[in-house]
């Protein structure tokens, strides 16, 4: 673990989570982050699917229920689409961006032979006319400057199609909170694997457990769909993030009440299995784990949506971690909520019995 600062309420950032957060891995370019995840899963049986998803499985009783706990490992990013004659890079988004966030950010391009630093720039405010200053910047008005003199110099370092992420390393702040890019959703992939590790050490399981680091969630929930066909689970739980409601501007009437320190958010709604919800809720209450309930009348816009309609239908639950400033380089989480989520999944899996009723 990495020591937290003196304001950090004794919480420490787990070493695996820290490494995952630092490793670039936008949707479709998750290879390096997935490699970190698989290396940490050496105690389990490891497989991959054709899309790049990673699966770590424990338990060998073929008659026991198989639960898949899925956290997508991809993050939002950018992809280089053009290099002009002056060596500047132009790009398209990978996933959903607020363009204003990108202005003036340091970035890292995964280039021909490694990481290439640069900055995201636009016309300086001094040169904008009054009408331009009133408008939200568009991505097509921005560029990336890696310091190269011309196209040839840039092409020696990067190529069209190379991925880009904002250069923002994890930072511990007060009250046991952690700030980083890629919390959405390295947190989910971390929780799935850490719960798997603890269940492996407990040796209490009566079920089989597959932790999944799914890919390409941010561009269409694709990786969880292929992983479901590979794993063929009897039930599944998606782990993702949701909006923490104790930040300014977040309306609890719209998203419910999920402040920092309230623990995991257990999903309930139209597309989620009532039985899996009840099992998660009962597990939290029996274990004394604080939680809140997040309701959805439509799609959840998480991997739970693709999991529950895979194959002939998979009873699926959703557990989310409250997060501030989603889809930004300063996503913030309370580490106590992360730990509580790991413990919920650990207790949930350890409590699954053969013959569990999952009927709807």
Describe the residue ranges of each PLM region.
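N-terminal hydrophobic/helix-forming segments and targeting peptides
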Residues: 1-360
